[in-house]
Amino acid sequence: MARVPKRNNEPTQNDDPAQGSVQAAAFSARRLLRAARVGTLATSANGHPFASLVTPACAPDLSILMLLSRLSPHTRHLMADPRCSILVAGVPESANPQTTPRVTVSGTAEALQDPAAKSRFLAIHPYAALYADFGDFSLFRLTPADAQFVGGFARAHRLDGATLLPDAEAVATIAAAEDGILSHCNHDHPDALAAIAAAPGAWRMVTADVDGFDLAQDERVRRFAWSAPVATATGIRTELVAMTKAARATARETH
């Protein structure tokens, strides 16, 4: 049976990290974070918890980017007290919502002016280009300090920042190669990207990192995970070749 590419990155019972290592739990948590298009941000409102819907995007190093308006209460909270947490969730395995994989990341948030980070955010949330340059909007970066990952019912892991975050050297290596990877795949292998996307239309690779990559078609963006973290451009090529073969084999089986 061909291996189907992992899409949307929700851990399932078959890859339960509780049955493996803490590193596997960290990888599953990163998959959820990098795939998340919506999350719940918890800030402090004069000492009281305040929960807000936000649209996160992960930088290559897993810091969490959020485009926030200063008109929003949660932004004012962060400016007064940068300590916060964010919850993102996957898809439940059954009718019981407690089977939903989820991760809560705690840390501190700061406003930043970084064109590369802004481009990263807009690659994940292209619709936000409509208001990203409004005067009241700023990009914030949440630096993870620790996390609580729950792979499903009664499958919890506490992860410190050092365990959760990807290898810094690998992050830097892939980040340095990313532009070349995107250009090569988009210009030379659009058919492979279409096979992996398994959906009509022209798909472009818009990000690549140690944990996976994102494909976009207009404002639709899909996340795909590697089978394991990669550390080099060669590792990415190996993963993409395997995913393309698996996707094409699956397409043949279903037609």
Predicted features and spans:
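Binding-site signature for planar aromatic cofactors or substrates
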Residues: 1-255
